[in-house]
Every structure is written in C-alpha cells, then in structure tokens.
Swiss-Prot record:
The keyword Secreted applies. GO terms for biological process: killing of cells of another organism; lipid catabolic process. The keyword Nuclease does not apply. Expressed by the venom gland. One of its GO terms (cellular component) is extracellular region. Keywords: Cytolysis, Dermonecrotic toxin, Disulfide bond, Hemolysis, Lipid degradation, Lipid metabolism, Lyase, Magnesium, Metal-binding, Secreted, Toxin. InterPro entries: PLC-like_Pdiesterase_TIM-brl. It is found in: Secreted. It is an enzyme of class 4 (lyase). GO terms for molecular function: lyase activity; metal ion binding; phosphoric diester hydrolase activity; toxin activity. It comes from Sicarius cf. damarensis (strain GJB-2008) (Six-eyed sand spider). This is Dermonecrotic toxin SdSicTox-betaIIB2ii. Belongs to the arthropod phospholipase D family. Class II subfamily. Binds 1 Mg(2+) ion per subunit.
Amino acid sequence: WIMGHMVNGLEQVSEFLNLGANAIEFDIDFDQNGVAKITHHGIPCDCGRLCTKQTVFTEYLDNIRHVTTPGDPKFREQLILLALDLKLQRIPVEKAYAAGVDVATKLLDHYWQRGKSKARAYILLNLPLVQDYEFIRAFKDTLKNEGYEQHNDKVGVNFTGNEDLDETRKVLKKVGVDKHVWQADGITSCFARGTDRLTEALKRRDTPGYNYAYKVYAWTLVKYSTMRRLFRLGVDGVMSNFPDRVVEVLKEEEFADKFRMATYDDNPWKKFTG
C-alpha cells in the first residue's frame, strides 16, 4: 500500500493518484465539541509541504465517493484505501466519543449514503493516541444503532502515536477489537527515525495468533535509501509525500519480485503469508 500523505485539497487527490498512490491519507480537524469540520493539517507539517490546504469534510467525502465508485465518470480504480488522520489530540479527551459518532454519521450520510452508494474503498481510522479509544467504541456503536454494521467489514483501526505496543493491544482488547488492525510507526519527514519499534511491530505481525497488527506501515518516507531499508524489513506499506519515488524503488531489481502494488482484491485485514 502506497499512501499519499496529507491529501487535504480536492485537487490533490488526482495529483497523488497520478504519482502512483493507491491510498490517500487526509487529516480531520474537529471543533471543541468533537464535530468533524474540515480536512486540514495545519502548522507544523512535513518539510517542503504546504500545511494549510483544507476542504469541508462533508464535501471531501462527497468528492471521494465519486472517485471510489465503479462506473462513475470520476472513478479511479487504483484508489482502494482511505486513511483518516483523526486530529483528536486537539480536542478534550472526553469528546472522543462524540467525535466517533460524528465521523461515523458523516460517512453514513456522505460516503456510504446509507446503502445507496456503491463507493468501495476501505477505511482506516488513524487515531493519534490510545487515550482516544472511546472514538472507536462510538464509531462502532453508531453503525450498530443506525443499522449499518455491515460497513464494519470495510473499516480498520490504527494508532499512529508510536506508543507502547502492549498498551495498544490492551486498549484494543478493551473496546473489543481483535481484527482489522494496522500498526503505524514513523515520524515527520524532517527527522530520521530508528527501526527498533518498527521491527518489533513486524515481529508481532508475523507471530501466529497475534491479532493486533495485520498490516504494518511506516511514515512519512521521502528518501530512497529509507524506502529501501524499510522494504528490506518487510513492511506492508508506506506513507510518502512522493509516491512516485516509492513506485521507482519497487521497480528496482532487488524488490521487483518481492513486492507489488496492492489492488482492490487484496484484503487489507488479512496477514500476507507469501
């Protein structure tokens, strides 16, 4: 999976897909009551990137629905996963539940359209910190209460804050999640990062019966050398400001026979066993 990073402007969707991404990550900014308002990262962000692009969240969902609906004039077959970077760290922790209700409701209304939409992308809910676990509970409660639990098949969760992996596992168990789990590891492209935690996450992914890391990805990669190093470790995906660079590396002799771009037929909630 190659995730285009910080795709918050509508015009950026095609830009990152044209560069080779098959997934996009966008930031969800909330008001202090937990209402999802806009796609917006804000300052600071990655070196060399403009942090200020934004779109009304519901408008973004309406647009991306078209892009991920087969038969729609805007359909782009390669876009198979949407990663929602939930900026919950900017609101009081007690509002995490309200935020989960709001995001689920807006996905129901504007992306899935309560059964009318044929939009098919997988959804990855990226939470910054384990303290925000009530968002997950609220999201699932809302789908259940509204009668649309079938959408859980397309939804996964992921914690992005580089916290202790055992704490992550405990929190996921607390909210009853033991499948559809990704594990991120990374840092802004402005800095270098070691691979100890990433290696441990990969080890857990490859442990039979471990259900809290079906896929492991690294963020945010810009250097060719870093991409090569992490591919050698066996990551399932990367997030990058330059998807075209990732595509280039994947075509190199060392990796061409070991990796390929994920397609819609690849299940993101299933461990790859070769």
